[in-house]
C-alpha cells in the first residue's frame, strides 16, 4: 500500500477567499508526475497522472462505477478507478487526516469484477431502468462531473465547513448544503428505496453502477461523520453540528424540531450564570432487584450515566428566566428514554415542594416514555406522589405551574404531571400520547392513523393550550410569568436569593 500526504492552500484561497496564506498548506490533489510542485511526497511508484490543470480534468481515468453509488461505500472511504491501460486501483481519500492512498490489490478487484459478471444474469438487471435513478445521467461518464472535480468538491465542502464556516453563518448563506459532502454522506434516497440486507449491482451503457444496500435503517449516519452532522428525522437532511445549537436544534431544511438534551434546554431557557442544580447526587438503587437477560438494571444505569454525564433522567434546579426566579425540571430522553423511576419522581417532588415554600413559578419540560418498568409499582407510585405535591402547590398555595410537552411525551408522565399545568405548552410536531402507536396496534389489532398523536391534532381537540416553537418560547414564558405577577429581581434581591439557595442546597 502506497501512502501520500496532500495539503491545500491554493485551492483554499481560491475557493474560500482567504487572504492570509498558510505555509503549512499547499495545492489540492494534483501533480504526481514529478513537476516543480509535487504534492505527493512519494513518487517512486508509477501512478497514473492526475494533472494539476485549471479544469482538474481526469481524462485518463475511467469510472469503475458511478460517483453517486460510491457513497454507499463511504464507510470504507474507498474509490475504485481504472486507467486507460486497464489497470484497476482502489483509492482511499481521508480529508480530515490528510491521507491519500492508492492500492492495486488484484485479488480484491478481480473478486469485484466477478460479482459484476455474475450479477449481469440476475433478474434485477433485466428489470432495472436507468431512468429510475435520477443521478444516472449526471454522474455517468460526464466530463463536468469527473473524478477530479468530485474529489475537489469534497475538499471544497470540508474546507468551507472547517475553515470558512463563520462567513456562512454571518451571511446566512445556504450554499454549503449544495456540496457533495452535504448531499451524499448519507445515501438517504437510495437507501430508503431498498430493503435491509439486500444487495444489487446495475450495469449498462459505458459505465457500471454498484449499489450495496445493507443498512439497518434510513436514519443511520455513517459513524465516520456523526461528529460533523445531525440528521433530521423528518426530511433526512443534514445539519452541521457546530452551529445546530445556534439554531436551537431546528432543522434548517424543514423547520422540524430536533431532539435536545436536558442541558441544552436549560441553556436555552435559563439566564447564563443563574443555574443552581438540586439533588444531583441522588441515584437509583435497584429497589426490586430487577435483572433482565441482557444486562442487570444497575449496569444499565451505570452505562447511561457514562453516556450522558447525568445521574438520572431529569435535571432539577433553580434559575432565572429574564431575571425572574423559577424552579425548573427538565427530563432527558437520552437517559433510558426519560423513563420515570423512584429517583425521577423524588427529584420532581422535592422541586415542587421547594417552589411551594419559596413561592416560585414551576416549569416542567417533559420528554419521557413513561414509568420505568425496572422499578415495578414503585415507578407507578411516582405519578401519585408528584400529583399530590402539585395539588398543594396549585390549589392550596395558588402558585403558577407551566408544563412544556416535547417529543415524545407518553405513558405515566402524560397521565400525571405532564397534563396538570396551569398552562400546557407543546412543541410543534411533538409526539404526545398515553400509549404509543405500536402498543395500540399490537393490543387492539387496529391501525392508528398517521398524525393522530401529533401535537397539532391534540391541539385542535383541546388537549393543551398553545403550540410554541423554540425560538419565541423564552419570551412567551416571560410574558406568562409577568401576567401572573412574577417579575425580575433587582440586583440586591438576586444576590440575596442566590445566598439563600446556596445555604439550603
UniProtKB/Swiss-Prot annotation:
Instruction: Give start-end positions of Low complexity composition bias.
Output: 189-205
Q: Where is this region: Disordered?
A: 189-213
Protein location:
Plastid, Chloroplast stroma
Q: Give the molecular function GO annotations.
A: acetyl-CoA carboxylase activity; ATP binding; carboxyl- or carbamoyltransferase activity; zinc ion binding
- Annotated InterPro entries: AcCoA_carboxyl_beta (IPR034733), Acetyl_CoA_COase_Trfase_b_su (IPR000438), ClpP/crotonase-like_dom_sf (IPR029045), COA_CT_N (IPR011762)
Q: Supply the enzyme class, top level.
A: transferase
What EC number(s) does its UniProt record assign?
2.1.3.15
Sites binding Zn(2+) sit at 232, 235, 251, 254
Which reaction is this enzyme known to catalyze? N(6)-carboxybiotinyl-L-lysyl-[protein] + acetyl-CoA = N(6)-biotinyl-L-lysyl-[protein] + malonyl-CoA
CoA carboxyltransferase N-terminal domain: which residues? 228-499
A Pfam family annotated for this chain is Carboxyl_trans
Any one GO BP annotation for this protein: malonyl-CoA biosynthetic process
Q: Describe cofactor binding as the record notes it.
A: Binds 1 zinc ion per subunit.
The region annotated as signal peptide is: none
What cofactor does its activity depend on?
Answer: Zn(2+)
**One GO term of the cellular component aspect?**
acetyl-CoA carboxylase complex
- Alphabetical keyword list: ATP-binding, Chloroplast, Fatty acid biosynthesis, Fatty acid metabolism, Lipid biosynthesis, Lipid metabolism, Metal-binding, Nucleotide-binding, Plastid, Transferase, Zinc, Zinc-finger
Q: What is its main location?
A: plastid
The pathway noted for it is: Lipid metabolism; malonyl-CoA biosynthesis; malonyl-CoA from acetyl-CoA: step 1/1
Question: Which NCBIfam families does the entry mention?
Answer: accD
How does the annotation summarize its subunit structure?
A: Acetyl-CoA carboxylase is a heterohexamer composed of biotin carboxyl carrier protein, biotin carboxylase and 2 subunits each of ACCase subunit alpha and ACCase plastid-coded subunit beta (accD).
The record's family statement is: Belongs to the AccD/PCCB family.
Q: What does this chain do? A: Component of the acetyl coenzyme A carboxylase (ACC) complex. Biotin carboxylase (BC) catalyzes the carboxylation of biotin on its carrier protein (BCCP) and then the CO(2) group is transferred by the transcarboxylase to acetyl-CoA to form malonyl-CoA.
UniProt-recorded name of the protein = Acetyl-coenzyme A carboxylase carboxyl transferase subunit beta, chloroplastic
This protein's species is: Calycanthus floridus var. glaucus (Eastern sweetshrub)
What high-level taxonomic lineage is stated for the organism? Answer: Eukaryota, Viridiplantae, Streptophyta, Embryophyta, Tracheophyta
Q: Which gene encodes it?
A: accD
Amino acid at each position: 500500500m502506497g501512502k501520500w500526504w496532500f495539503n491545500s492552500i491554493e485551492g483554499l484561497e481560491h475557493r474560500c477567499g482567504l487572504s492570509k496564506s498558510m505555509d503549512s498548506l499547499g495545492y489540492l490533489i494534483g501533480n504526481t508526475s514529478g513537476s516543480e510542485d509535487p504534492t505527493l511526497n512519494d513518487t517512486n511508484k508509477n501512478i497514473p497522472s492526475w494533472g494539476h490543470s485549471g479544469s482538474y480534468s481526469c481524462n485518463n481515468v475511467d469510472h469503475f462505477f458511478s460517483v453517486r453509488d460510491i457513497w454507499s461505500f463511504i464507510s470504507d472511504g474507498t474509490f475504485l478507478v481504472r486507467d486507460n491501460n486497464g489497470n484497476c486501483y482502489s483509492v482511499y481519500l481521508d480529508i480530515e487526516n490528510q491521507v491519500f492512498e492508492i492500492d492495486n490489490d488484484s485479488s480484491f478487484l478481480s473478486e469485484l469484477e466477478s460479482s459484476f459478471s455474475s450479477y449481469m444474469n440476475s433478474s434485477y438487471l433485466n428489470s432495472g431502468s436507468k431512468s429510475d435513478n435520477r443521478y444516472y445521467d449526471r454522474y455517468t461518464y460526464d466530463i463536468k462531473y469527473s473524478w477530479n472535480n468530485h474529489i475537489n468538491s469534497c475538499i471544497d465542502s470540508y474546507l468551507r465547513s472547517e475553515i470558512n464556516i463563520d462567513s456562512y453563518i454571518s451571511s446566512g448563506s445556504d450554499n454549503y448544503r449544495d456540496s457533495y459532502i452535504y448531499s451524499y454522506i448519507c445515501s438517504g434516497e437510495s437507501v430508503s428505496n431498498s430493503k435491509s440486507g439486500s444487495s444489487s449491482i446495475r450495469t449498462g451503457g459505458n459505465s457500471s453502477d454498484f449499489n450495496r444496500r445493507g443498512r439497518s435503517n434510513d436514519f443511520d449516519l455513517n459513524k465516520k461523520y456523526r461528529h460533523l452532522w445531525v440528521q433530521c428525522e423528518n426530511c433526512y437532511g443534514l445539519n452541521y453540528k457546530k452551529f445546530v445549537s445556534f439554531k436551537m436544534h431546528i432543522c434548517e431544511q424543514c423547520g422540524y424540531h430536533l431532539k435536545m438534551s436536558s442541558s441544552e434546554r436549560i441553556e436555552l431557557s435559563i439566564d447564563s450564570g443563574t443555574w443552581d442544580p438540586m439533588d444531583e447526587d441522588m441515584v437509583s438503587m435497584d429497589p426490586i432487584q430487577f435483572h433482565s437477560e441482557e444486562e442487570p438494571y444497575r449496569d444499565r444505569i451505570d452505562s447511561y450515566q457514562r453516556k450522558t454525564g447525568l445521574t438520572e433522567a431529569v435535571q432539577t434546579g433553580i434559575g432565572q428566566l429574564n431575571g425572574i426566579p423559577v424552579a425548573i425540571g427538565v427530563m432527558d430522553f437520552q437517559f433510558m428514554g426519560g423513563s420515570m423511576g423512584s429517583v425521577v419522581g423524588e427529584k420532581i417532588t422535592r422541586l415542587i415542594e421547594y417552589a411551594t415554600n419559596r413561592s416560585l413559578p414551576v416549569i416542567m419540560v417533559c420528554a419521557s416514555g413513561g414509568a420505568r418498568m425496572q422499578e415495578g409499582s414503585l415507578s407507578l407510585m411516582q405519578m401519585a406522589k408528584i400529583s399530590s405535591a402539585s395539588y398543594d402547590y396549585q390549589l392550596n398555595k395558588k402558585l403558577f405551574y407551566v408544563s412544556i410537552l416535547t417529543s415524545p411525551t407518553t405513558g405515566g408522565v402524560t397521565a400525571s404531571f405532564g397534563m396538570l399545568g396551569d398552562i400546557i405548552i407543546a412543541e410543534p410536531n411533538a409526539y404526545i400520547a398515553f400509549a404509543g402507536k405500536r402498543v395500540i396496534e399490537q393490543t387492539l389489532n387496529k391501525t392508528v392513523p398517521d398524525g393522530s398523536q401529533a401535537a397539532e391534532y391534540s391541539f385542535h381537540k383541546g388537549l393543551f393550550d398553545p403550540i410554541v416553537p423554540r425560538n419565541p418560547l423564552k419570551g412567551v414564558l416571560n410574558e406568562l410569568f409577568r401576567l401572573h405577577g412574577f417579575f425580575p429581581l433587582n440586583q440586591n434581591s438576586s444576590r440575596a436569593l442566590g445566598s439563600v439557595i446556596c445555604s439550603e442546597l
